[in-house]
Swiss-Prot record:
Sites where the protein binds substrate: K163, S192, R249
Identification of the protein by name: Homoserine O-acetyltransferase
Recorded name of the encoding gene: metAA
Location in the cell: Cytoplasm
EC number: 2.3.1.31
Length: 310
């Protein structure tokens, strides 16, 4: 899938080195195919890493995608330069009158705070409310999934006894849903979190459907209102070394973390980690874009979304 991005976005060069098809604005204009308009609310601290991870994941289906990155104006990033955010990110005020085919809300390292204690919570719920009328389908990742479940469905989050970190086995729970089409019966996916959405509250809500579950990591994928909202509790976008970097960062902070599960060969943190979830992640993004975005969204984004949202 070709992705249209700004010509000078830092991720562009690395994507091209990996033979991922990206195009700049000039080339995209010459094509007579409407791209899918995807907006990414990037709440992760090192935004360039998440940009690259998500763009990789979105690059594997045969449709052109136009990606817009969204920031929270009420939060000042400590790990990404203001110049990068100013150059490559839009504010909500700048995009609030637009419609989008799809939206991704990322995770954020704020799990131990109550939702209302997060300094951009009010702005985030404004964005989530706006998405009901302006976005065909939204996929929420990790803390973004917990926040979305809390806002849209009142699902509370719970503090885990210790950090859940590693790559865990999951099983498909509902084969009839297109989102899990092509998934193996048992597949691997990474997690890195201190909290979880209440399992019982999810199971008790008739508007929510569990599509993938894990004995060790808990509920993984939840479908809301037939696909209007999708909640992914882990981090399928993570690169091979992301958990490694987080683990060593925690050691440097004196946290004494447990070794990520099912990650290092022979549990040796000096060896190259195993990448066992890439095909699952690619399948997840492809199915979302195809079945919950492309086949649902109006060709003319100016049309009323009341007639098209799932």
């Amino acid at each position: 899938m070709p992705i249209k991005i700004q010509s000078d976005l830092p991720a562009k060069a690395e994507l091209e080195e990996e033979n991922i098809f990206v195009m700049d604005e000039n080339r995209a204009i010459s094509q007579n195919i409407r791209p899918l308009e995807i907006i990414v609310l990037n709440l992760m601290p090192i935004k360039q890493d998440t940009e690259l991870q998500l763009l990789r994941g979105l690059s594997n289906t045969p449709l052109q995608i136009d990606v817009t990155f969204l920031q929270m104006s009420s939060h000042v990033s400590k790990n990404t330069s203001a110049s990068h955010i100013k150059k490559f990110y839009q504010t909500f005020e700048e995009i609030k009158n637009n419609n989008y085919d799809g939206m991704i809300i990322t995770g954020a390292p704020v799990e131990k705070l109550d939702f209302e204690e997060v300094n951009y919570w009010d702005e985030l719920i404004t964005v989530m409310e706006w998405s009901n009328k302006h976005v065909t389908s939204t996929i929420h990742i990790c803390w973004g999934a917990q926040a979305g479940l809390y806002y849209h469905y009142g699902i509370k989050k719970e503090l885990l006894p210790k950090k859940l970190s590693g790559v865990y086995k999951h099983r498909v729970m509902n084969r009839k849903e297109p989102l899990v089409r092509g998934f193996d019966d048992v597949f691997m996916a990474p997690h890195s979190r201190y909290t979880q959405a209440s399992r019982q509250q999810i199971l008790d809500n008739p508007r929510l459907k569990v599509l993938a579950d894990s004995d060790e990591a808990g509920i993984y994928i939840v479908l809301g209102d037939g696909g209007k909202e999708i909640f992914v509790m882990g981090h399928p976008e993570y690169d091979r070394l992301t958990l490694d970097q987080e683990y060593k960062r925690d050691i440097d902070k004196g946290i004494e973390p447990d070794l990520p599960v099912n990650y290092y060969p022979d549990d040796d943190c000096n060896r190259k980690p195993l990448l066992s979830w890439r095909s699952h992640a690619n399948n997840l993004y492809t199915n979302w874009l195809n079945y919950y975005v492309y086949q649902i969204t109006p060709y003319d984004l100016n049309e009323s979304y009341d007639n098209y949202c799932i």
